Amino acid sequence: DILLGLMKRLIKHRASDLKVLITSATLDGLKVSNFFSGCPVLNIPGTIFPVEKFYSTDRPTNYIESSLRTAIDIHVKEAPGDVLIFMTGKDDIDKMVSKLEERIQNLEEGSCMDALVLPLHGSLPPEQQVRVFSPAPPNCRRFIVATNVAETSLTVDGVVFVVDCGYVKQRQYNPSTGMYSLDVVEISRVQADQRAGRAGRTRPGKCYRLYPSSIYQKEFL
């Protein structure tokens, strides 16, 4: 926001030789255009397949456990396809990966296909991050447990199901203490849409939102 404000000020002084190109997968193009005195907007649509969305009746008290149950239900009941599970950070991802691997091992043998659980976050070494781009072995479903890095930064082929806990970890400034902290906060509506869209990149998919539709409509900004 600060950068856009500075660019608008610079344009007034250097309109003849300063050209600004803003690209984004999430910004509201009309708002940005109005802010920059009605500048043109170019839309480059991608191929998006339909995504069916399912909402929880209420907010779960423990989003990790709720995500875990949803992932297991998908594995047992749904057709083949990889699952992308959004968590807030490395600690949540580590817990989710451990619990999911344990729960899958305890499933009745032959009741479902094999499974491969992969974490994805910025702290992973590059050689571990690129594992998510390798296709799943035959008769195997991949579970990719990721931070918001998987919202817009990359597309993972094979993802058909998305589990969205509705939270993200963000850097917040506390004016009373003058310090920053990493806090778990609700995602925005744009982020929710981006997460759901991950399920429709290569074929029709499903998104399981662990919050009611009323929260998406009224509370997400």
Predicted regions and their residues:
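P-loop NTPase motor module signature
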Residues: 1-221
